[in-house]
């Protein structure tokens, strides 16, 4: 976590901008070492997983990069067509996650939103997963989400201690 992500001074950011604004092409290339790698995360519900059937129906924290973020933005603000909020509990579209390897790195180019809207599914009295509807008790949905969602506090910003500042300033 860089302190600049919450508006605090950062020696990493200072070094990045010093190198980036340099007239030296070598320094500008070195700036890439200090540039940020954007990552995002959200809660998702696994609808189908052929490799891990036990994950189906579970709510997990999904961490992703810029490629998936751009796909989400295209759903929210499409160049043509109707916008769709993929996070809508009733009308969110299914996201088909297809990960391939390109030059040894995970590639998400083949992942896409499917035209089919899929609501959140919760277990009924018998444990069978059933889709929620507008008539589903909101308190039931809230309780399900609260009790079954991943703990996101471990992903919160972590303040640097003096050891971290000392290490970065070496």
Where are the regions a protein language model picked out?
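Extended serine/threonine-enriched, polar tracts that run as long, contiguous segments within proteins
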Residues: 61-151
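OB-fold ssDNA-binding interfaces and closely related basic DNA-contact patches used
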Residues: 1-87, 151-167
